[in-house]
């Protein structure tokens, strides 16, 4: 009993697609937040906050909250 080359190609393609889909498991790291020690005054610009946070060694920063504080973020 001979298997056709088209069937072999189709099965190989199916297995490759399944292996690719099953291999795409994404793990998301937790993010830790800390108030900036160097930022002074109300936080009106998230880009300024991010620059100050980068200088403090964090990966990013954002203005948040009612009091508009600069919060620095990094992976935990």
UniProtKB/Swiss-Prot annotation:
Disulfide bond positions: 32-76, 43-63, 49-70, 53-72
Main location as per UniProt: secreted
PROSITE patterns recorded for this chain?
A: GAMMA_THIONIN
State the UniProt keywords alphabetically.
Answer: Antimicrobial, Disulfide bond, Fungicide, Plant defense, Secreted, Signal
What start and end residues bound the annotated signal peptide?
1-29
Q: Can you say where in the cell this protein is located? A: Secreted
Its GO CC terms? Answer: extracellular region
State the source organism's domain of life.
Answer: Eukaryota
SUPFAM superfamilies reported in the protein's UniProt record: Scorpion toxin-like (SSF57095)
Query: What is one Gene Ontology biological process annotated in the Swiss-Prot or TrEMBL record?
Result: defense response
* Gene3D superfamilies (alphabetical): Knottin, scorpion toxin-like (3.30.30.10)
Q: Which family does it belong to?
A: Belongs to the DEFL family.
Function noted in UniProt: Confers broad-spectrum resistance to pathogens.
* Name this protein carries in UniProt: Defensin-like protein 5
* The species this protein was found in: Arabidopsis thaliana
């Amino acid at each position: 009993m001979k298997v056709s080359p088209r069937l072999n190609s189709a099965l190989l393609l199916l297995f490759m697609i399944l292996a690719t889909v099953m291999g795409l498991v994404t793990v998301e790291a937790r993010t830790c937040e800390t108030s900036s020690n160097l930022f002074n005054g109300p936080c009106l610009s998230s880009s300024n906050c991010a620059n100050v946070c980068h200088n403090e060694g964090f990966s990013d920063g954002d203005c948040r909250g009612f009091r508009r504080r600069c919060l620095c973020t990094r992976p935990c």
